C-alpha cells in the first residue's frame, strides 16, 4: 500500500510520537523511509546576518558562514542518527535528507523527488500554538501534498 514514506521531523515531541506510528506501517507493506529535516530559511538568514556584521571586523566572513552552516548540518545529522537506527531496527531501508529552506516547500519538493506514497507528520511542530489543533506546516502539507498524509495528533 505505502511502499515509500516521507517522515519530516523537526525533533519536536509530536514528531517523536509520529515515529511510533511510522514504525507500525511496516506491517502494512512500507519498505523505505525518507527521513527529512529542514533547516529553516530563517536560521540560514540569521547566520547570514550574524556573519555580515562580523565581516567588518574579520575578513574570514565567507569561510565562517559556510563553516557555521556545515556545523549546523552536522548537528542535525547527529540528531537523526538514533532515528535512523530505530527505523533500520524496525526493518526499513532509510534515506536521510537534510534540506535548507522553507519547511512546506522542502517537504513537497522531497515528496516529488523521492516519489513517496505517503507522508507521516505530526499535527504540531516546535512552534506549536496553545489551543491550536494543527500547525501551519502540517496544515499546508496536508492541503498541498499529492500523496496520502497521515497526520499524527499530539
Placement of each model-derived feature along the sequence:
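Small/aliphatic-rich secondary-structure junction motif
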Residues: 1-62
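Short, flexible loop segments at boundaries between secondary-structure elements
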Residues: 147-154
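A short acidic, glycine-rich active-site loop
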Residues: 56-75
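Glycine-rich, Arg-bearing micro-motifs that act as flexible, cationic patches
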Residues: 118-143
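Structural beta-alpha unit
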Residues: 74, 78, 82-119
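Short, well-ordered secondary-structure micro-motifs
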Residues: 45-48, 108-109, 132
Amino acid at each position: 500500500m505505502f511502499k515509500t514514506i516521507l517522515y519530516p521531523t523537526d525533533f519536536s515531541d509530536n514528531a517523536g510520537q509520529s515515529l511510533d506510528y511510522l514504525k507500525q506501517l511496516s506491517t502494512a507493506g512500507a519498505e523505505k523511509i525518507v527521513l527529512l529535516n529542514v533547516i529553516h530559511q530563517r536560521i540560514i538568514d540569521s547566520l547570514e546576518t550574524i556573519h555580515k556584521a562580523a565581516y567588518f571586523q574579520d575578513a574570514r566572513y565567507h569561510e565562517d558562514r559556510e563553516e557555521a552552516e556545515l556545523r549546523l548540518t552536522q548537528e542535525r545529522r547527529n540528531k537523526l542518527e538514533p532515528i535512523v537506527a530505530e527505523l533500520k531496527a524496525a526493518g526499513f531501508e532509510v534515506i536521510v535528507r537534510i534540506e535548507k529552506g522553507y519547511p512546506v516547500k522542502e517537504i513537497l519538493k522531497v515528496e516529488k523527488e523521492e516519489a513517496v506514497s505517503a507522508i507521516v507528520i505530526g499535527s504540531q511542530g516546535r512552534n506549536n500554538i496553545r489551543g491550536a489543533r494543527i500547525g501551519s506546516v502540517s496544515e499546508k502539507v496536508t492541503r498541498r501534498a499529492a500523496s496520502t498524509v497521515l497526520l499524527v495528533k499530539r
